[in-house]
């Protein structure tokens, strides 16, 4: 299965006990199975596993939010360009950048009762969908569409629905 090429930059705070590159690659493959526009090796994504300070600074600069967030996505292509990228046989096109915050990811994983690996996998899928032009902040229908794609991608990896409401 084709998926975007991932260029990884991993801050030491993430540690080396876990193969983060493998986790991101598997997440990209699953995302490409549910969002075919991502199923192309001529798309390039920069994935940065950063500390909270770096994500905080970027979130403040680009979104005017003075706090870290779990994942930031910076698309380089419009939705239309993503859809047409598959036809381009040339050099890889830059789909965009994705940055995950270690501390936020770790805290959220603990709150959800899942491993950091599981939550990071979800965030990579989520970020890739943003880079492909999906946006849950545009409205309820868009949020539902994006969440359904996330659920399907995660299910392919044996990961439970992150949006399930527990009683």
UniProtKB/Swiss-Prot annotation:
GO terms for biological process: rRNA processing. Its main location: cytoplasm. The keyword Calcium does not apply. It is found in: Cytoplasm. Signal peptide: none annotated. It is an enzyme of class 3 (hydrolase). One of its GO terms (cellular component) is cytoplasm. Its cofactor is Zn(2+). Binds 1 zinc ion. One of its GO terms (molecular function) is RNA endonuclease activity. Gene3D superfamilies: Metalloproteases ('zincins'), catalytic domain (3.40.390.30). The keyword Zinc applies. It comes from the Bacteria. PROSITE patterns: UPF0054. Its EC number is 3.1.-.-. Keywords: Cytoplasm, Endonuclease, Hydrolase, Metal-binding, Nuclease, Ribosome biogenesis, rRNA processing, Zinc. Zn(2+) binds at residues 126, 130, 136. Pfam families: YbeY (PF02130). Single strand-specific metallo-endoribonuclease involved in late-stage 70S ribosome quality control and in maturation of the 3' terminus of the 16S rRNA. NCBIfam families: rRNA maturation RNase YbeY (TIGR00043). Belongs to the endoribonuclease YbeY family. PANTHER family: ENDORIBONUCLEASE YBEY, CHLOROPLASTIC (PTHR46986:SF1). HAMAP family: Endoribonucl_YbeY. This is Endoribonuclease YbeY. It comes from Novosphingobium aromaticivorans (strain ATCC 700278 / DSM 12444 / CCUG 56034 / CIP 105152 / NBRC 16084 / F199).
